[in-house]
Swiss-Prot record:
UniProt-recorded name of the protein: Pheromone-processing carboxypeptidase KEX1
Chain segments annotated as transmembrane: 521-541
Biological role: Protease with a carboxypeptidase B-like function involved in the C-terminal processing of the lysine and arginine residues from protein precursors. Promotes cell fusion and is involved in the programmed cell death.
Topology feature Cytoplasmic, residues: 542-638
Organism lineage: Eukaryota, Fungi, Dikarya, Ascomycota, Pezizomycotina
Positions with biased composition (Acidic residues): 583-594
Length: 638
């Protein structure tokens, strides 16, 4: 092996050693976390013509010890009003998927019989971003290790706050939006607990120091399971009013017997343990059983309908038969970034989640509402008139007994209650409004347990009023909505407003957030690059030093133009005093020798000053042409 080959082999050996060290150090660094781009949904099977609503979907880990992951589906707003808003929607159960809300209630699309998607007229994404979350763990597309299900409301709340913190890390440009929580049924327990946790979180010094408070602006709960005591005791009065059960009959006596058992249980229970009481659950079941005729029974979610016994409403709404197969298609789950290794198929409601979530140690959320209202948080409760399971009479009785801000129920002053104001929408009698001291109640006539399923346009009008959207300065076709005969703020349901100024503000906000995200995501890469640069620098320094020790060629590091043999360069330094080579960096020669050699080289160059300068010379025409090629290449790549 020759000297040059030995030197090359030595250099490669050194380089490979340092490369191995660099890779080992890189492996010690944490794996780069997912970015928002990893959750982007660029298309959906069956999507309608035209641009798809901007959306992101996928899993976020909230408990690594139990493999607990929440699934979310986020839809960006279609237009911006005066400011950006985000609405988090939760379905109930417990254990029922929020994809019900996304595809049957307030989301931008609904699934047709042939599994196509149709745009919903009156969807809530017109002026607000929508975030649907499958929770607790194990619900819908969310997953968790077997046996690690949540059983109490404080556990659920803690996991949900963790999810929100991680979600805002992925999507920081939404963190300062006005934030609302909405949902129905058992979400009447979830939402007040989450709201309480957010308000408490905002008071922490660590959160305030980082300016990471969340702008919680209001809650909307439809047909909510908020006060179990009031709901249990409202079943028979509601059944009497709606003609489901006739008073003085054997059927009514059987129902009254179950109520007596429930009352005994309620009278011995303390504040906690009253969210789920088996003896009280029997009241609803007895009423439903009394409607059993042939193979049919009443639909407990919409008393205008019947269902096969013993489903009695579990097969409703009719869109469910389209949604379940659609959400199980492989190309749909792939588009939504579902982890196929952990989630085998979408189910509307999980028996395992519901069976474990008994909240036996949790107090009912009705006890949280007064303080939330007193702290200035607006709350809107709405009910569908034809729902039995979470009927409006139970909600109204709860409000009547609730005390907050120095009054009881909707008292304006002692003995004076806020009036019920008739609500008409597009010429039809839609229901009534009642409001006092931060609480609003809306009853929807002829509506079921899932009011947005029946009336998407009316619920959108209700939403826009509650969150303060006024299209007067935005544009769009106003909806004819009147409360107590007054039009109030102008809303636009299903219109196409123009909001250029607000859109520009949102664009700038997202641009700023994007830069912050880039800086954050680049931290790990920057560390790796810095380590690699240091190692590479050390390697180059050592290689050059070794080269100077072993090279038989002249040193060109001080005056490069004197090192060209073609133009009278310095003669190579010869071995002296037993040295194999002169080490310039180590000053392995005396100054007199260097002066003599430089003097001879300069004299030699002076005698040939008439020769053309050739060191590093480039042909200008070739350089210009090369630049042109590079520019053409850039154009091609773009």
């Amino acid at each position: 092996m020759g000297f040059s080959e030995t030197r090359a082999y030595s250099a490669w050996g050194a380089w490979s050693t340092w490369l191995t060290i660099c890779l080992a150090l890189a492996n010690l660094l944490p794996v780069t976390a997912k970015s928002a781009a990893d959750y982007f949904v660029d298309s959906l099977p069956g999507q309608p013509e035209g641009p798809l609503v901007k959306m992101h979907a996928g899993h976020i880990e909230i408990n690594p010890e139990t493999s607990g992951n929440f699934f979310f589906w986020h839809f960006a707003n279609s237009h911006i009003a005066d400011k950006p808003r985000t609405i988090v929607w939760l379905n109930g159960g417990p254990g029922c998927s929020s994809e019900d809300g996304a595809l049957m209630e307030i989301g931008p699309y609904r699934v047709t019989d042939d599994h196509m998607l149709n745009r919903t007229d009156g969807s809530w994404d017109e002026f607000a971003n929508l975030l649907f979350v499958d929770q607790p763990v194990g619900t819908g597309f969310s997953y968790v290790s077997t046996g690690a299900y949540v059983s109490e409301l404080d556990e659920m709340t803690s996991q949900f706050v963790t999810f929100m913190e991680k979600w805002f890390e992925l999507f920081p440009h939404y963190e300062k939006d006005d934030l609302y929580f909405a949902g129905e049924s058992y979400a009447g327990q979830y939402i007040p607990y989450i709201a309480r946790a957010i308000l408490d979180r905002n008071k922490k010094e660590s959160v305030q120091a980082q300016n990471r408070q969340w702008n919680l602006k209001g809650l909307l709960i439809g047909n909510g399971w908020i006060s179990p005591r009031h709901q249990y005791l409202s079943y028979l009065p509601y059944a009497y009013r709606e003609g489901i059960i006739q008073g003085g009959t054997d059927a009514s006596l059987r129902v009254e017997a179950t109520i007596s058992k429930c009352m005994k249980k309620l009278n011995v229970e303390d504040t906690t343990g009253t969210i789920h009481i088996a003896d009280c659950e029997d009241i609803l079941q007895t009423i439903v059983d009394e409607t059993h005729k042939g193979n049919r029974c009443i639909n407990m979610y919409d008393i205008r309908l019947t269902d096969a016994y013993s489903a009695c409403g579990m097969n409703w709404p009719p869109d469910l038969k389209n949604i379940e197969p659609y959400l199980r298609y492989k190309n749909v789950t792939e588009a939504l970034h579902i982890n196929s290794d952990k989630q085998t198929g979408w189910t509307e409601c999980s028996g395992a989640v519901g069976g474990n979530f008994r909240a036996l140690k949790s107090k009912p959320s009705v006890e949280l509402l007064p303080r939330l209202l007193e702290e200035g948080l607006p709350i809107l409760l709405f009910s569908g008139q034809k729902d039995l399971i979470c009927n409006h009479m139970g909600t109204e009785d709860m409000i009547k007994d609730m005390k907050w801000s120095g009054g009881t129920g909707f008292e304006l002053s002692p003995g004076v209650w806020a009036p019920r104001q008739d609500w008409t929408f597009e010429g039809d009698s839609a229901g009534f409004y009642q409001q006092a001291r931060n609480l609003t109640y809306v009853l929807f006539y002829n509506a079921s347990h899932m009011v947005p399923f029946d009336y998407p346009r009316r619920t959108r009008d209700m939403l826009d009023k509650f969150i303060g959207v006024d299209i007067t300065d935005i544009g769009g076709n106003p909806a004819d909505s009147r409360i107590g005969g007054e039009k109030g703020p102008t809303t636009s349901v299903g219109g196409h407003p123009n909001s250029t100024t607000a859109a520009e503000r949102e664009k700038e906000k997202m641009k700023s957030a994007a830069w912050k995200a880039y800086y954050k995501s680049g931290e790990v890469a920057l560390i790796v690059v810095a380590i690699a640069a240091i190692i590479w620098g050390v390697f180059i320094w050592r290689s050059r030093r070794q080269k100077l020790r072993n090279s038989s060629h002249e040193y060109r590091g001080i005056y490069p133009m004197l090192g060209s043999s073609s133009s009278g360069s310095l003669p190579r330094f010869s071995n002296k005093r037993g040295r194999s080579a002169d080490d310039v960096e180590a000053a392995d020669f005396d100054e007199t020798e260097l002066d003599e050699r430089l003097s001879r080289a300069v004299s030699s160059r002076s005698s040939r000053e008439h020769e053309p300068y050739a060191i590093g010379e480039e042909d200008g025409s070739d350089r210009e042409g090369e630049g042109s090629d590079e520019r053409r290449g850039l154009v091609d790549k773009s």
